[in-house]
From Swiss-Prot:
GO terms for molecular function: threonine-type endopeptidase activity. The lineage of its organism: Eukaryota, Metazoa, Chordata, Craniata, Vertebrata. This is Proteasome subunit beta type-7. Keywords: Cytoplasm, Hydrolase, Nucleus, Protease, Proteasome, Threonine protease, Zymogen. Induction: Up-regulated by the antioxidant dithiolethione (D3T) in colon (at protein level). It catalyses: Cleavage of peptide bonds with very broad specificity. Residues 1-43 form a propeptide. The gene is Psmb7. InterPro entries: Ntn_hydrolases_N, Pept_T1A_subB, Proteasome_bsu_C, Proteasome_bsu_CS, Proteasome_sua/b, Proteasome_suB-type. Its main location: cytoplasm. Gene3D superfamilies: Glutamine Phosphoribosylpyrophosphate, subunit 1, domain 1. Belongs to the peptidase T1B family.
Length: 277
């Protein structure tokens, strides 16, 4: 018996079928006094660079909630495995929970295989998870680490796309940080040179983006060591008071004084005794 096939072959190109629906919904919401939610602005500058022997990751430490600085010294460099770390930009809860989940899954993978996890494995786990949620997990990540195949550096976008580059930046201050990388990066840098370059890139994001600020954290990963430098530098130091700004009593002369007595008329008075028994 022949079966009727209901499968419809996919049509190429982008579909705009939902655009008219969204316009109708927006008009209905406007009539009822509702407003559609707007995109939430998040502020961060994270960056990474490949040097001769490993990876240097960097991040600022300012956490914002709208236009308010919620935390001046939060850590944005997350542990994935002993040889892999990840910087997170975007929604703080999403970056924290995503990196914790991938760190646990990567530890199970390492126990199963009996080998040190590779950076490409963490990258694949992260991109598959983020792509599954179609961008609703607001986590923009910079993944870096060193394994048996050498140092690797990835940028991972909230929708699941990834780039493998010798230097990457993410976050609202990424343009300023990328300008520093484009100007001063060179292959096979020494460790101190790479740390200085990443620090300058994060500082550029701090001074040119209101969503980034406070301190600069660095994480240096190589085959022989792991250095977590928190803080590496403090470009925004709080100023000190140069003196007291209080005037002594009697400094300002009183020219005139007028005292008006306050007249109160008692209309009703109730006395309630307290029970002390």
């Amino acid at each position: 018996m022949a079966a009727v096939s209901v499968f419809q072959p996919p049509v190429g190109g982008f579909s705009f079928d939902n655009c008219r629906r969204n316009a109708v919904l927006e008009a209905d919401f406007a009539k009822k006094g509702f407003k559609l939610p707007k995109a939430r602005k998040t502020g961060t500058t994270i960056a990474g660079v490949v040097y001769k022997d490993g990876i240097v990751l960097g991040a600022d430490t300012r956490a914002t909630e709208g236009m308010v600085v919620a935390d001046k010294n939060c850590s944005k460099i997350h542990f994935i495995s002993p040889n892999i770390y990840c910087c997170g930009a975007g929604t703080a809860a999403d970056t924290d929970m995503t990196t914790q989940l991938i760190s646990s899954n990567l530890e199970l993978h390492s126990l199963t295989t009996g080998r040190l996890p590779r950076v490409v494995t963490a990258n694949r786990m992260l991109k598959q998870m983020l792509f599954r949620y179609q961008g609703y997990i607001g986590a923009a990540l910079v993944l870096g680490g060193v394994d048996v195949t050498g140092p690797h550096l990835y940028s991972i976008y909230p929708h699941g796309s990834t780039d493998k580059l010798p230097y990457v930046t993410m976050g609202s201050g990424s343009l300023a940080a990328m300008a520093v990388f484009e100007d001063k990066f060179r292959p096979d840098m020494e460790e101190e040179e790479a740390k200085k370059l990443v620090s300058e890139a994060i500082a550029a994001g701090i001074f040119n983006d209101l969503g980034s600020g406070s301190n600069i954290d660095l994480c240096v990963i190589s085959k022989s060591k792991l250095d977590f430098l928190r803080p590496f530098s403090v470009p925004n130091k709080k100023g000190t008071r140069l003196g007291r700004y209080r005037c002594e009593k009697g400094t300002t002369a009183v020219l005139t004084e007028k005292v008006t007595p306050l007249e109160i008329e008692v209309l009703e008075e109730t006395v309630q005794t307290m029970d002390t028994s």
